Each structure stands twice: as structure tokens, then as C-alpha cells.
């Protein structure tokens, strides 16, 4: 036929059997990729330190999605929460990966069958004897089935009625585990951070889908609407399907980037807004203040801060710090976190406590400035020493560590004080191993950043695809340059399928 690459899909335009075949093959490719990617990630994943080297630091992409749906154990004997397991059962990480690969193989065979046996009686209209699809009826069937799946997921899987539940955590990502979730039917169900909304929304949306599916199966569209929306044309289906997909892609890009109950920080890493707003820093200070109020010493109060909480309060875990095109995991950037050095508290020679101004998200470099409790600049690391008034040496700044590996250690040497002041710009200070992976010291984004960028990009692309195919199907007669009511048509553009011998033609 000699079709150009951008027009090859016309071969399945009037061929329902092979249209099904290529869609089944597409499903085979998607499921096969998911299963294969899961096996690859399991081969390279190190589960030994879920606190300082979690899945999102290692660049895992499909493991977090399995985990949020209730998979926590591996046939390798480890659990994502850090313990060991003896009998993970079929629904382990490897079991899910294997199920996807088996399903992919079955879809591959089904696609071949449908490609070979394309001319089935089910595709033939009894009234005309020609191949055609009852698209409104098919729409009703798909709506009904997707409604059943949606309702079933919310009713059984999420609630734990028949299933594991989903990953649920506290607001600071410290106590996450898989558990059953009760539907939230009140106004709290609309809070994107309330897990109960996931159950209730799936139940409600599934119910609506079932009812809408039954409606479309039992009620035929009015003739005017059928013709106006070109419901008999398969390209209408393509256009509206693309619309559904790009809308969903925009929504999940938002829930991933801004955070929600569906994207827990323990699985995907913190959001950039948690750094921007000092979210974890405030919680750490609240806990320390509570400890001091209970007559604990500063050292005791800081020592009770969970290492996991301190690690979230580090700019290297901010997904907006990694460039969009810097390949590799976070561990390949600043290195593998080994331990928390502790919280540095700086003081000048007059005994005032000084706070290092933290680096904003979109800065690569930032001046080292130390302010007192009132926000007044008291010390800095000057660019020009000749003009300096607030240098560490002049002000006599010292640093002492509380909690962590350097608990109780203090430094007054200006070079060391400046070193830790620079590191304090980046949040809590951690020892990072850059040798093991030959990490280059340049920040990388987390899977949260990749997912958002990918889905926002494809959503934009699919938006234009929706406009393109929607315009093509609505204005097909205009683009072809022919009155659709003409009895004969001979011009190239109006043929639905190139080389179709059934297209009526006559020599003019």
C-alpha cells in the first residue's frame, strides 16, 4: 500500500477484528514492560536500609506502585518495612511481576489469533451484511465493566474486605504500613490526604459507572445526537478516549507533584513544597520543644528525633532539585546516606543562637548567612574578606551538635564551623557515601519528579491528539472537500480506508 509512517493506522480503520488485535498486542506490551521492569528493579533493589536508603532514593519506579496497593514481601525473604518473611505467598513482588509477564504472553497469543481470524460473524451487521460495530452499545459494555472493576476495588481491595488494603501513613511519613481503610462518606472524604476518600470515591464512581453503563446499554442515542457527534465513526471513539486519558494524566501529575494519600512520601519521596514550607523542620522543632518542656536536655530532645524524620528535612530529597534530564537515581547524585551527623546549633561569642538561612529550591548556590532569633543577620561567609563585618572569624561563631553521630561534639575552628554552616544550608546534615556508586554530587530527582514530568508531557501531547482527531471526525466532510450526501465519490481524501474496494466510485 505504501503508506507514510504517520498514516499506517488506517489499515485497521474498517477492520474491527484487527483493531482488537492491535489493542490486545498493546496491552501485551504494557503488561510485559511492567513485569520485566519489576523484575529488573527487584534485581538491583537493596532493601537493607528502609530509613536512609528507601526505594525512592534508589530510583525505583514500579515497586512503589505495587507497594501502595498492598504488596510488601519478596520471595527473597525481605519485607519493604525492614523485617524478614518466611512465606510471602503468591502475591509477592516477584509474584505480581510474574503474573504480568504471563498475562502479557496470553495477550500476545490472543492478539495473533485476532489478527489471523479477523473476519468474525460478530462484526457483521445482520441488516446490511457489512462489517460494522455498534459503538454506543460497546461504550455501554465498557462503562459497565469498568464500573464493576472500580466498585470492586473500592469495596473489597481498599477496605480489606477481600484484599490487603492500601499503604497508609501519618502526615510525616514515619509509620506507614499496608492496612484496610474504611470509606469516608463525610466532607473529609474530599481531602486529598485522607485515605478513606480513596475507598468512598471508588465505590461512588463505580456505582455511577455501572448505572451509566446500564443506561447506555438500554437507551439508544437520539438520531440528531448520533449524527452530530459522529457516533458511528471509530475516530470519534479514538478522540474521546484520548480525552479521557489526557484528563487522567493531568490529574495524576497534580496528585503526584503536590502530594496526596495516593502518593505516600515513604514510597515516592517528599514533595518540593514540604521543603519550601519547612514542613519537616517545623515538626522537628515542635518535638524538640515538647522534649524540653518535659525537662529533657537539648541533647536528649534532639536524640529522640527519628532519623527518618531528619532525613526528610534534607534538600537532596527535594524532587525539584534534580534536573529533568539528569539520568539516574538520587543515590547516583549526592550518594547513599549512611547516617545523621546530628543537628548543628551555631552561637556567636555573645552566646546568641544563630540559624543558617536555608537554600531555596531553585538555587544552585546561596550565600551562607546566619541570623538570630529575630531574623537579624549576625554572621556570614563573606564574598570579599576586605569588606567583611560579619565573618565567622570576626563574630567568633562556634557550632555544637545535638543528636546523631556527633552528639555533644563542638567546634570553634572557623574552617570547620564554615564547613558545617554551608552544609546546614541544605537542611539536616548527613554522612553520604559517594564512592560505592561513583556518585557525582549533582542532585537527582526522585520518581515523584519523573512521574510528574512524564505524565504532564504526555497529557499535553494527548490533548493535542484529542483536538486533532476530534476535528477530523467532526469535520471529515469539510476536510475531504465533498458533500457527504453525494451519491458517488471519487476523490482521494474521502475514502475511509486507502485501497478499500468496497468504496463506491464512478468515473466522472
UniProtKB/Swiss-Prot annotation:
GO MF entry, a single one: chlorophyll binding
GO biological process: photosynthetic electron transport in photosystem II
Transmembrane portions of the chain: 21-36, 101-115, 140-156, 203-218, 237-252, 457-472
Presence of the UniProt keyword Glycoprotein in the record: no
Chief location bin: plastid
Coiled coil: none
Subcellular localization(s) per the UniProt record: Plastid, Chloroplast thylakoid membrane
Record flagged with keyword rRNA processing: no
Pfam families associated with the record: PSII
Free-text cofactor note: Binds multiple chlorophylls. PSII binds additional chlorophylls, carotenoids and specific lipids.
Family per record: Belongs to the PsbB/PsbC family. PsbB subfamily.
Record text on subunit structure and interactions: PSII is composed of 1 copy each of membrane proteins PsbA, PsbB, PsbC, PsbD, PsbE, PsbF, PsbH, PsbI, PsbJ, PsbK, PsbL, PsbM, PsbT, PsbX, PsbY, PsbZ, Psb30/Ycf12, at least 3 peripheral proteins of the oxygen-evolving complex and a large number of cofactors. It forms dimeric complexes.
Name of the protein in question: Photosystem II CP47 reaction center protein
Naturally occurring in which organism (per UniProt): Citrus sinensis
Lineage: Eukaryota, Viridiplantae, Streptophyta, Embryophyta, Tracheophyta
